[in-house]
UniProtKB/Swiss-Prot annotation:
Its EC number is 1.18.1.2. One of its GO terms (molecular function) is ferredoxin-NADP+ reductase activity. It comes from the Bacteria. This is Ferredoxin--NADP reductase. Belongs to the ferredoxin--NADP reductase type 2 family. It comes from Limosilactobacillus fermentum (strain NBRC 3956 / LMG 18251).
Length: 330
């Protein structure tokens, strides 16, 4: 027999998890579906030990700590959770309800909240001969466990916030960290750059990796070419950590039987987080509206906005408390 829900949240990153918590507060029958085998989205999957600074009241929380805190918060007002389950289709029925299909089961829901971020993500690869064969060994795209780099020489490639954060995170465990960027200036927050300037990290700019070779002791020599010059220099390291950003793809949405208005691959929403399809809301990095800022903190504001407004639509005669202090928790 199909399960019937008031709300189905698709995506178990920070915004989706906070939305699930709010469903529990409003005593809505809700399910949270996540394609990965664990909750937490990109912070938990990509940088569990990296510190996140843009969450109010959580100064320097790691990606995994943030996911754990959100999971504990959901337990205050639990909802059904289905992990390792990819939604293959969402169909709007004639009565306005939705049928949600996955490879494992089928369920129905009165409303949908899409919290899938930018969809499946993959790192931009180091385009050098031999780099692919070294993936997971000398060449890495993630620093999930900084102890993997203990007492090693590490070259971090990239010049944005994420690259600098990775370099700073490894500074206290690595023997030496090098930051290689093709420009003289870094594209990062001023505070982050100030931390870099005060660190022991050796900045190599403006250089671009030209080739790499594996040495007899399994270290790697990166040959760096200076931009707009003939100068080259070798750099011998134990690990190369590439941080050129990620490509993302919400192709799964295109397979669903929902005609969602979008802009450059992101879902258009109004001030209540409604999409162009009645009964479907969207929150997080995968949505667009005027003035949108793609931060975890922004998603935390969008989640209660979406849940409170859809709750009013589902139960217009029910008085909806807005503040948790009015909901009898604790």
């Amino acid at each position: 027999m199909e399960e019937r829900y008031d709300v189905t949240i698709i995506g178990g990153g920070p915004a989706g998890m906070f939305a699930a918590f709010y469903c529990g507060l409003h005593q809505l029958k809700a399910q949270l579906i996540e394609a990965l085998p664990q909750l937490g989205g990109q912070p938990a999957a990509l940088y569990p030990e990296k510190r996140v600074w843009d969450v109010a009241g959580k100064a320097g929380v790691t990606g995994q700590e943030l996911a754990d805190d959100l999971a504990a918060q959901i337990e205050v007002a639990p909802v059904d959770q289905f992990l390792g389950e990819k939604v293959t289709d969402v169909v709007k029925e004639d009565d306005g309800s939705f049928t949600i299909h996955s490879a494992k089961r089928t369920s129905t829901s009165k409303s949908i909240v899409i919290a899938m971020g930018n969809g499946a993500f993959s790192p931009r690869k180091l385009a050098l001969p031999g780099a692919e064969e070294l993936e997971g060994k000398q060449v890495r795209y993630f620093a999930n466990h900084k102890e993997d780099f203990k007492d090693q020489r590490v070259a971090v490639l990239g010049g944005g916030d994420a690259a600098i954060d990775m370099a700073l995170m490894l500074e206290d465990v690595a023997e030496q960290v090098y930051l290689v960027h093709r420009r003289d200036a870094f594209r990062a927050l001023e505070h982050t750059v100030a931390q870099l300037e005060a660190s022991t990290i050796e900045k190599l700019t403006p250089y671009l990796p030209k080739d790499l070779t594996v040495n007899a002791d399994q270290s790697v020599t990166l040959n760096l070419k200076k931009m707009r010059a003939d100068e080259e220099r070798p750099l011998e390291v134990d690990k190369v950590l590439v941080n050129y950003g990620f490509t993302s793809n919400n192709a799964a949405l295109k397979d669903w039987s929902l005609d969602l208005a979008s802009e450059r691959g992101q879902i258009k929403v109004d001030q209540t987080m409604k999409t162009s399809v009645p009964g479907v809301y969207a929150i997080g990095d995968g949505v667009v509206y005027e003035g949108k800022v793609a931060l975890i903190a922004t998603g935390f504001g969008e989640a209660p906005t979406a849940i409170t407004n859809l709750a009013k639509e589902l139960y217009p005669d029910k008085r909806m408390a807005i503040h948790s202090s009015s909901m009898g928790i604790g």
